[in-house]
């Protein structure tokens, strides 16, 4: 039983690492996308803001549908 408990702890540690990595990657991608959009303000301004607005809207809609 103790060995099983240890395995569960190891699994939790692994998943925690994975989740933190995914969160870090998401934020990194978001900031890269954000700055990339600002560098190309003249041509891609409308497209960039439309994409951000749409993605935020989708997240809000998903949150509302979950509740």
Curated annotation (Swiss-Prot):
The keyword Transmembrane applies. It is a single-pass membrane protein. Keywords: Membrane, Transmembrane, Transmembrane helix. GO terms for cellular component: membrane. It comes from the Eukaryota. Its main location: membrane. It is found in: Membrane. The chain crosses the membrane at residues 19-39. This is Putative uncharacterized transmembrane protein DDB_G0289959. It comes from Dictyostelium discoideum (Social amoeba).
């Amino acid at each position: 039983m103790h060995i099983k408990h240890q395995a569960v702890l190891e699994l939790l540690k692994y998943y925690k690492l994975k989740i933190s990595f995914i969160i870090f990657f998401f934020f990194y991608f978001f900031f890269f996308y954000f700055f990339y959009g600002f560098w190309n303000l003249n041509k891609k301004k409308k497209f960039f803001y439309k994409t951000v607005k749409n993605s935020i809207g989708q997240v809000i809609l998903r949150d509302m549908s979950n509740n």
